[in-house]
Swiss-Prot record:
Cellular component annotations (GO), alphabetically ordered: extracellular region
Main location: secreted
Subcellular location: Secreted
Protein name, as recorded: Brevinin-1ITb
Length: 20
């Protein structure tokens, strides 16, 4: 579960801040 969360966080930040 932890690796999954670590993979999702950057994607969420990317979507929210529009910085990909």
């Amino acid at each position: 579960i932890v690796p999954f969360l670590l993979g999702m966080v950057p994607k969420l930040i990317c979507l929210i801040t529009k910085k990909c």
